[in-house]
């Protein structure tokens, strides 16, 4: 091993001391005339000559005899060897400034020179990604409704909607609700505006606007309700419904009306209440054109046109379109509560 790679110490050997980052770097000398590096350290030279030669990469030959403090730039070739990644020319970093490194009394070893390491701590600069790189990153399989990054080239489905290519969203032209997929908008139009509920329960005849809603409803007839309220004994099919029901007993109403301040247990109830202030009636009957603020009122109204009576009295078999009418019939005609 060349002698210039070793740092002598009177207290302990080098393997007993902490190593510095500079210890692992090879020492080179730089000739400002030829702009070339040569390995420092020769077996024939004394330690004093080795120390002087170790400083030759910092102090040019013209100035090392005068020992006048002067700032000098570290050559770009050495900078490119020390910095990983892009070269110094590509990073456009100015030369390192050497400060007060020519005083031989204040310099115990070659790796404790006084030049500034600030330039090595500069972060990399960021540039705009090229169009070629952007197109390469955007290559991926197209999903069912088109890319989630790029708008679909095909025209949107006609569900009385307005399509925004900038945000990949679908707007209902009647109530301005926004949906992320055309399927979601289709279900919304069918439920809220068209009044069409093509999915009917074979047991009780209740209709739904979506197949998933019908599937969840059929579980009521086929399975036992397993979630029971311990305060009133009422049972529910889903735990989420029980959690909403418990708000009634705790009198927790986290959703206030922005117009009158009235509070509600559920956000949907608050939204239905706001239609009283705004006068909005988004649910319209397709037969007679009558509009309603709540979809449940539209469902009940549509039974007048179809003649469907899902609620029947178990004593006289008389049918009713509304549950409240059946309850009133039981109280008045059969004295039941």
Swiss-Prot record:
MF terms in GO: DNA-binding transcription repressor activity, RNA polymerase II-specific; RNA polymerase II cis-regulatory region sequence-specific DNA binding; zinc ion binding
Chain ranges of zinc fingers (C2H2-type): 170-193, 199-221, 227-249, 255-277, 283-305, 311-334
Tissue specificity of this protein: Expressed in erythroid cells of primitive and definitive lineage and bone marrow cells.
SMART domains: ZnF_C2H2
Region (Mediates repression of transcription): 1-20
Any one of the GO BP annotations: chromatin organization
Assigned keywords, A-Z: Chromatin regulator, Developmental protein, DNA-binding, Metal-binding, Nucleus, Repeat, Transcription, Transcription regulation, Zinc, Zinc-finger
GO cellular component: nucleoplasm
Region ranges (SNAG domain): 1-20
InterPro entries, sorted: Znf_C2H2_sf (IPR036236), Znf_C2H2_type (IPR013087)
Subcellular location: Nucleus
Keyword S-adenosyl-L-methionine: no
Known function: Essential transcriptional regulator necessary for development and differentiation of erythroid and megakaryocytic lineages. Alters histone methylation by recruiting histone methyltransferase to target genes promoters. Plays a role in heterochromatin formation.
PANTHER family according to UniProt: ZINC FINGER PROTEIN (PTHR24394), ZINC FINGER PROTEIN 271-LIKE (PTHR24394:SF44)
Domain topic, free-text comment: The zinc finger domain is essential for erythroid expansion and acts as an activation domain whereas non finger domain serves as repression domain.
Protein name from the UniProt record: Zinc finger protein Gfi-1b
Gene: GFI1B
